[in-house]
């Protein structure tokens, strides 16, 4: 029963990125795209390695990781001998995941797909392969020696949980499994913020990744499902918006990769879009240039960066500038979400609005959200006071930004999975064999508060 002493494995599979690691660590050991490249039917028996990512591999998320890719064999897609992936035969599997999948798909032998769309698994066969490579090749561990904490989006269908259980207990033979709602884990991660004085599992989580933005109210660790709202604006939409602006200007490089780099390195949220336009018009130094080099560094392209620096993340607050399909600003959606909750929990939901995910990392994102949301709340209170003739005590609106924000869900899972009681809340292989996959429809809540 060595699994009782081994750290739990924490896996956060998002639409855009997957984060892998062990409980108790401050950051995931591996972060790479949730992508898989599978061999085309006519290329299932490749001999020359054409299209294989021989030079580029998934990289560890921190220096000195023992699972670095230095032993990667580009011709086979596996690790060299004398390791778990060799033991399990993953070096013979004709597919790649993560960054290696992106490279392999550039050749004629492989096709690229993303098994998760808008937070939900769409292709379970590809997802199982993705997990298999994640466990044996990157984490280099035996599932029967570890408990696993996996994350899920809000309102995930129970049938999806059962599918996960079947894969992890039957295909991987894992010791135990816990499936946690991402919003609850994000709340736990926010405890690292200096603004948080009470380790509460009550709050409103704004989780914005690559594919979708969720606004999720949580009361004492339980998600208020009827009030959840989804916003069809996230990181990928911002990248595409930047790309469209670059194309309109006829820039030298308008690739998605360049747009993504500009988003990550140059974009910020401004307090007033009209004033920001005026600042740029008066001060040319606010414009920037981005240099794009090819892989051999023999060609250079210069891309001018202008208004998209503040226009791109502005679509959260003025979505009409990018699309006519969705017109409700994020602060309004947050207010509507909280107002749809029971009145006795609203104060706590306004007072603890937690940001999670890479698309909330723009400079001054939290400050702008707090200002706009506070304005909405104050206007409602003023109108209520006018109609009732009474004086309100007001509502404290607080948006929490913290240093673990980018990997908040994974870090929250790491915090909770390292507790002494975690394994007691997991469902084990024995439970699965006795009760079947429906046992994972419910998990007991952590007594963390």
Swiss-Prot record:
Subcellular location: Cytoplasm, Cytoskeleton, Actin patch
Domain of life: Eukaryota
SMART domains named among the record's database cross-references: ACTIN (SM00268)
Any Gene Ontology biological process: actin nucleation
Classification via CDD domains: ASKHA_NBD_Arp3-like (cd10221)
Pfam families given in the database record: Actin
InterPro entries referenced in this protein's UniProt entry, alphabetically: Actin, Actin/actin-like_CS, ATPase_NBD
Gene Ontology CC annotations of this record: actin cortical patch; actin cytoskeleton; Arp2/3 protein complex; plasma membrane
Any one Gene Ontology molecular-function term assigned to this protein's record: ATP binding
UniProt keyword terms in alphabetical order: Actin-binding, ATP-binding, Cytoplasm, Cytoskeleton, Nucleotide-binding
SUPFAM superfamilies: Actin-like ATPase domain
Described function: Functions as ATP-binding component of the Arp2/3 complex which is involved in regulation of actin polymerization and together with an activating nucleation-promoting factor (NPF) mediates the formation of branched actin networks. Seems to contact the pointed end of the daughter actin filament.
More about this protein: Present with 6650 molecules/cell in log phase SD medium.
Family note: Belongs to the actin family. ARP3 subfamily.
Self-association state and partner proteins as the record states: Component of the Arp2/3 complex composed of ARP2, ARP3, ARC40/p41-ARC, ARC35/p34-ARC, ARC18/p21-ARC, ARC19/p20-ARC and ARC16/p16-ARC.
Protein name: Actin-related protein 3
